[in-house]
Structure formats: structure tokens, C-alpha cells
Amino acid sequence: MIYEGKAITVKALESGIVELNFDLKGESVNKFNRLTLNDLRQAVDAIKADASVKGVIVTSGKDVFIVGADITEFVDNFKLPDEELVAGNLEANKIFSDFEDLGVPTVVAINGIALGGGFEMCMAADYRVMSTTAKVGLPEVKLGIYPGFGGTVRLPRLIGVDNAVEWIASGKENRAEDALKVHAVDAVVAPEKLQEAALDLVKRAISGELDYKAKRQPKLDKLKLNAIEQMMAFETSKAFVAGQAGPNYPAPVEAIKTIQKAANFGRDKAIEVEAAGFVKLAKTSVAQSLVGLFLSDQELKKKAKAYDKQARDVKLAAVLGAGIMGGGIAYQSAVKGTPILMKDIREEGIQMGLDEASKLLGKRVEKGRLTPEKMAQALNAIRPTMSYGDFGNVDIVVEAVVENPKVKHAVLAEVEGHVREDAIIASNTSTISISYLAQALKRPENFCGMHFFNPVHMMPLVEVIRGEKTSETAIATTVAYAKKMGKSPVVVNDCPGFLVNRVLFPYFGGFARAIAHGVDFVRADKVMEKFGWPMGPAYLMDVVGMDTGHHGRDVMAEGFPDRMKDDTRTAVDVMYDANRLGQKNGKGFYAYEMDKKGKPKKVVDPQAYELLKPIVAETRELSDEDIINYMMIPLCLETVRCLEDGIVETAAEADMGLIYGIGFPPFRGGALRYIDSIGVAEFVAMADKYADLGPLYHPTAKLREMAANGQRFYG
């Protein structure tokens, strides 16, 4: 053994060839943490010191090669002073460069996935052999940063600027054939042939058949582009990528600027340019929010996994109520491998559900994400029915009938009589109390909420709601089924609106106040979209439906009369009373026309302004910042209350619920992380400026205490 560490070993194989093997002890995957980097430095030094070494192959002892840097270390690292962070980055980069500069040929064998720092390690080798099932990529932009271990330097010198920009700016994972096509790897072989192919390559390089020094040299030199070629490549790509990423996600464009700045430098100077830009991005609130979001998502997955032991296996599911929602649930279950019965009392409901599932499956086939055979398989897994005949075999039933307590009570009581005693029944209610709905059941312990968000196939969140009598088995089984469907479940306790709708309606309340104070709803939409929301409040209400919004607001007003009851006539009342229900009937705040693709396109309708005139109580001169605060303060404060009331257990779950459920701007990290970014004391002071707008704007006593003590939601 030439070197043995806790993450890396180096052993002699044959004829002067050594194997540098990544196998991080106590972990299921390899990652670049401090320990691994330290091991790599010592391993490279050991290889350099051994005169008998003629070639190196790099392998992984795990099912994946290296998943990237250890993101849990980012939070503390990114707090370091700039100079210290740059120095640490350059120190790490020297390890990769020392490996690249070894006086012998190096070949890396890529199995599973090699992402971020994992793929940057691969690029430091002379040759790359990749398994047919492996994937490679540089996903750092998804964390608000760009590659920091030489990725912006080596990749453009390996595969050309255009290809490198596409890989880095998109952050996508690339399959073996695509990597080979652009020369990011040198060979692709079957997984079982990987070691053999790597050994063959290194032997050919040792014998002189392959000139490894000539292969290595372009990575050490400046980019082979003249000034005109550089201008054409970089200026065009910057404009295109800026349009794609938008102003709130600077990392993709900064990556291109870094490649451009370093284009005329050799490797070492180019890496210094990369390090300076990397640190600049690491210090942005966007990077801090996106790194936090990643860690919160990991926490969410961990919490969901903790329920696995208590969960019963769901082999057959059922959905009550077909239509668009039922069809979406059936599609999601079937396409992820769980057969499902889809029951409705009307044939047209069944047909609508089947049409929805067929449409969604057809789109996947069109995009090449599903074969026609798999589509047929998924469709066959959806069994339409108008009776309860087969419900005796069902493990879980999702009730998705109309949002009416009486109807739901009747349907729930009825289905309970047709399922096994241990079957779980879940309601897809968006606002009605689970404990109240459970009153219709003989076995309330087997009942919980399972709230999907529209459109089901696109929205990652499922709220799993615990009622007063819900058992842990019911929660665990529902969480496991949601995960099986490819969703991100968040367990919440029962209250009107649960987590997401309870938080969303105060946001709409803020919007109603803005309109009452003379704000043009089109302006409000533009301001909130610029803030980062996928759509503004007026457009969102049109998409949700004025009838749904009106009903939801009444439920919330009944549940929280002290702050959500509004005796004044609001914009939603006006639209609802005028039968302007939104997209569903072609008129709401906006009017809707069909575009060439048959999708509703919003247009400004003067009649909407006429209808709203009588409810403008006073015209206030409100800035864009005021408009943002009118809506964001109530949303954030209600999220705080949900955490304080124990509706949701952690800040991470609250924030991820909003990001996955209503499209809260990811780069802002969620409502509680947004408060942290402003500062708790500063946020409280800001809310106090709007105190005259009512109780929705009044911070809780506990939040004031946090402000006084300098506390945060995230350490």
C-alpha cells in the first residue's frame, strides 16, 4: 500500500501502475470535504515520491464516483473573510494541479455520477473513461455559485467555449454518449469493462502509443481563440444566458465572464481569476439562500425517510373523484409505478380524468422522457371505475371530491365501508380541518390529509396533515406513498389552511389592501414578478379561480377572525360577484384569449378597472418597495406564527413548503430565510411602519423577543 487514508487509498497494481481509489469511510457516497482534500494531497505527494510509479488510474469504491463538494461545509466557509476564502480555494486547487502535473499518465474511471468537484477531479486527469450508465456535470450554478476547483478553466479548454458555457450555465447532468460527443471523455464502455478500459488506456500511454503530455498541454495553456472569436463566443452567450437565467440568478453569467477574463491566461493564473469570482458569488445572498435551500431539502428528505420504518407498503391506491385533479393524481401514481383505481360517480368525470392522464403521458413521450410502451403500461395501471367493487384490496385512498365539508363527510363515510380495516384514507382538502372531516369516520386513526398542489405533475409539494386522532402509521404510510409518487412531503399539524394556504391568504390580504389604496393590479403583478414570484397576485388569483379564492378566504376568516376577517368589500369580492372567476371562465382581473398553442393568454381588460374603482378607499403614493412589503410582511409573519404554533416543526420545512407549494422565489430561500436576510430586528421595525394596515402586520411577541436578543431562524 503506497498510501492509506480515511477517504483515499493508493495501491500498486502491475508494471508500475497504481490505483488511487476514492472510498470515504462511513459514508454512502464520495464527496470532497476537508478530509478527502487532505487525503488527496497526501496521496499525490506519495505518488510523486515513489520513483517506481509509471501510471495512475483513479477509481471509486462506491456506486458513484464523487458527488461533488460537501455542501454542509459551505455555510461556515462562505462566512470567512474574502482573503481567507480565496486562499483556501487556491490551496485546494493546488492539490488538483499537482495531480494534473504528475510526471506519469493519469486515467480516471467514471462510474455512477461525477458532479461538481467530482467532475473537476476527472478533468485534472489526462484521460477519462466513462461507464455507459454514468453521468457527469457541473451543477454549481444551482447553488448560486460556479465551479471552484478549476472547472471554468479546464472545461472550455477541453470541449470548447460554446459547449463549456452550455454545461456550466445550465448545470445539467450529461449522459455518457453526450459527454463523448463533445470530447469531455475519451471512451465509453460497459460498467463491467470500466477498470479494464482504464488500465488499457494507461498502458498505451506508458508505452508511448498515446502522447499523454500532448493531451495534457491544452489544459495548461490559454484558450485557442483570437480576439474576434472570443468576442463572438462570449458576448453572444452572455446575452443569451442572461435572458435565460434572469436578473435574480447571477451565477451563470458570472461563470461566462470568468471564462472570458481567464481566456488569455495559462492554467495557474486562470485559476486565480476563477477563485476571485467564486468568492464574490459565494458572498451573495443568492448563494447563501440557494445553499440553505439545498440543505433544507436534505433535511426534508431525512425527515421523510425517518417515517419509512412505520410505513405500510402501498401496492394499490385509489382516488375518489376523477376530473383534472383526480386524473393528475392517478397519472402521478401510475407513472411512478403504483397502480391506482380512479372512481367517479359520473362517466364524464372518469373521461376527464383519463384524458388528463393521457395528455400528461403523451407529453412525456413527445419529449422523449417515456417510451410508447411505458405510456401504455402507465395507462393500464389506471383503472377507471364507477363502483367500489375492487376497493377491498386498496392500501390507500385519496379523496379528491369537491371542496365541500358535507360532500366530503358523505364520501369519506361511504368509502370507509368498502376498504380494509387497515387501509389509509387521505383527503386532498386544501382548507377544511382534518379533525373535523374525521368526525364522519369510525376509524379516524387511519385518516389524514394529503394535499396536492395544482398542477399535480409539476408541483413537488404534498402536505401530509395530522388530525387529532391520526396515527403515526397513517402519517408514515402517506409520506411513503407521496415519496413513491416522486413528491416532497411535509408533515404539518391541523389548522385552517394548514401551512401553505394559511400563509398564502394573508399575502392575498396584502394585495387587497394595495388595491384599496389605489395600486394598479397590473403594476402589483409586475413588481412581485420582478421580486421573484413566478406570477403576480392578480394573475395567480385568476389561475386559482375567484370562487376557490373567495371560499378559501371565508374559511380562513372563520379560523382566524382576529386578523383574517375583512368586513370591507375587496377586489376578490368584486370579481366574484361579477362572475369573473379567472381563467376558468375567461375573465377575472384579466381577460383571457387562446394563443396559437391553445393556451390562455392574459390581456388587460378596461372593464376590470371600472369594477374596481368603487373599492379604492384612498389613494396612497406607494413605492415598489411598499407594494412588496404590503404582501410580503403578512406572508412572512403568518409563516412565523405557523412555526410558533407548531403547525410545522422546523424553519426548513416551513420554507421548503412555500418554495415547493406556491413558488416562493428560491433565490430568497423561503419566508423565514428572507426575514434572516433582512435581519429579524430590521424586519420587525419594517413591519411596525405598516402597523396601521391591521393585525396581519403586527409581529408576534416571540418575534420581538428574537429581535431584541439578536436571534435568527437559521444559525
Swiss-Prot record:
Keyword Signal in the entry? The reply is no
Q: Name one GO molecular function term.
A: delta(3)-delta(2)-enoyl-CoA isomerase activity
> Residue ranges of region 3-hydroxyacyl-CoA dehydrogenase?
312-715
Reaction(s) catalyzed by this protein? a (3S)-3-hydroxyacyl-CoA + NAD(+) = a 3-oxoacyl-CoA + NADH + H(+); a (3S)-3-hydroxyacyl-CoA = a (2E)-enoyl-CoA + H2O; a 4-saturated-(3S)-3-hydroxyacyl-CoA = a (3E)-enoyl-CoA + H2O; (3S)-3-hydroxybutanoyl-CoA = (3R)-3-hydroxybutanoyl-CoA
EC number, as in UniProt: 4.2.1.17, 5.1.2.3, 5.3.3.8, 1.1.1.35
**Binding of substrate: at which residues?**
297, 501, 660
Its domain of life reads: Bacteria
Residues that, per the record, bind NAD(+): 325, 344, 401-403, 408, 430, 454
Site note Important for catalytic activity applies to: 120, 140
Gene Ontology CC terms: fatty acid beta-oxidation multienzyme complex
Keywords on this record? Fatty acid metabolism, Isomerase, Lipid degradation, Lipid metabolism, Lyase, Multifunctional enzyme, NAD, Oxidoreductase
Pathway per the UniProt entry? Lipid metabolism; fatty acid beta-oxidation
Q: Which residues form the active site?
A: 451 (for 3-hydroxyacyl-coa dehydrogenase activity)
Which Pfam family, any one of them, does this sequence belong to?
3HCDH
Note down the stretches annotated as region Enoyl-CoA hydratase/isomerase.
1-190
Name the Gene Ontology biological process terms: fatty acid beta-oxidation
The family classification in the record reads: In the N-terminal section; belongs to the enoyl-CoA hydratase/isomerase family.
Function field: Involved in the aerobic and anaerobic degradation of long-chain fatty acids via beta-oxidation cycle. Catalyzes the formation of 3-oxoacyl-CoA from enoyl-CoA via L-3-hydroxyacyl-CoA. It can also use D-3-hydroxyacyl-CoA and cis-3-enoyl-CoA as substrate.
Subunit structure, interactors included: Heterotetramer of two alpha chains (FadB) and two beta chains (FadA).
Q: What is this protein called?
A: Fatty acid oxidation complex subunit alpha
Source organism per UniProt: Stutzerimonas stutzeri (strain A1501) (Pseudomonas stutzeri)
